[in-house]
């Protein structure tokens, strides 16, 4: 029997680092299946009111070269991330952000960074499905039920999340294959993390495939097995990922920074690029009709009143 997931969030103040819009909060998401609720404590960002949403002047500085002190680079990255998040936040108007991409592409890691700097809440749709059906892993859900059962519950979770605001959601790798899921995600902004298959296969081979049911198969060469299966999945899902509002290519980021390997990129590098792509998307659609165009017009009206 399909489990139906209902989401309810209750926030309460907690001790954070610093003060003002960046102060952290603790949130609680309650997933109810039938009559048995399961509670999970989630780390979320702090609120961002009109003052926090007002963008700063565009930032055109470049990060320090990789030859400089690593601490200097970290400070540069943090400042750029903060400045860019404040610019993007002004135009989001509370709309959710959905990260899509292949398994192992870093969606959860990048989503947490984006949620922190935007003052949004973070959710992992796979974790919510696990809580909804009362099982510890996606692999076990596939084993004891089926992929179709998992996909049904995944759609239910995305449906419930789509009714909320100010979320960054890391979706499962296969969430894009169902058109109804795009209906839910299009209520917000979707970002595709496009990672080369070779890099994905190396990552997955290092950590193992036990938690990834579509890849878990006996093999004397984990890399070859992972690359083969990932290639097949990419062929099946490539067009679906391209439906995203913005594409973040790790190869392009690496090339701009002079790297020959995407593994040299930091999650912050990727998060900054995601914010740039989101900003490009919303500004390019500022004159269009529909939800995104209405979003920009409303943001521009609020900015005019604030001046």
Swiss-Prot record:
UniProt keyword ATP-binding, yes or no: yes
Presequence range in chain numbering: 1-60
Annotated stretches, region: Disordered: 285-307
Cofactors: Mg(2+)
GO cellular component, one term: plastid
Function (record text): Catalyzes the specific phosphorylation of the 3-hydroxyl group of shikimic acid using ATP as a cosubstrate.
Protein name (record): Shikimate kinase 2, chloroplastic
Species in which this protein is naturally found: Oryza sativa subsp. japonica (Rice)
